[in-house]
């Protein structure tokens, strides 16, 4: 029976298996959150709300209509911790880890699944990659958790140790949820330079990606790094300061956000929000209180996201970087895109263009559906677009509309978060048919522009 089931599953497209694996685990998470032992009983949790929570957590988005501190028990919070840990690492990575720990040989089909889940080119070295990912994850979370636990212990006693490690996982997986309660939130924690720095580093390490981290650990010299790692690091060096400047200039005089802080605290908070806006979605203030100009720019940051093979989402920093360099090369009349004296494969540029186009279309479709499906909508299209970008990019920022959506809107946002987690490349490959012929037709140009 099991052999027949395995043979049937092996015939499915690997993209279908990846999507199915995430969907099944999200459903499993919803059932765990529905258990009476998971809830405090302060607020009714319907199955749809539990499923929304599970999808949000496993996709490491972090959108929630509940207060994890008051609405869920310690067991429920541990369920959330488990879901975001698996969601951050990926279903296929966790399954491979279980197989490796039991001494079982990882089959070629499983190696291909891991490769496809990370959008890598070759299945070679997948077992070693999984081991490194697990080791890096546990090491970073343990170090960050120990520092946070020591701080929270001085503030909250023994429960502070639990809070420290819980938030370390939330930061590294870029889920961006907290268990401090809506009355305190993360704003109170991030006001402390120690907590802010540790959480920022955790978010950044999770957002840089496992491939780049492994490359940095193996090679300590810039010249020895791969082109991929160099490009990822350069994009971070550009985007982080850019985000800091945006927040400081546009929100520095806004009393509802950063205006009430000292100059040093403004810079610190701007740095924190610059990283969080593309990765975890931790927030230090009410997002709805931001200036309109800031909201538009933050939507762009969320859409860009973090690096490939990371715990964060978005279209990826490499995608937007390649598109901008391709545009610059075209303006200068150059056929090839050259980065650090290396010519980029044209196939990479095609993939980047396709990812950007598909992601843009899906995001706007999501925003339109949310806006149209809410009959008594008291928000404008810009708010709907902000929520759609946040869901698709798995950042989790919200204009405060999460608790007010009707059932169709919740389903639309869940689909957006799901697609954002598996990635548009996986989605496209899953539904794309196999090429049926290699016939080359005559070439002719079409007028553009």
Predicted segments — roles?
Residues 1-449:
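Membrane-proximal intracellular helices of multi-pass ion channels
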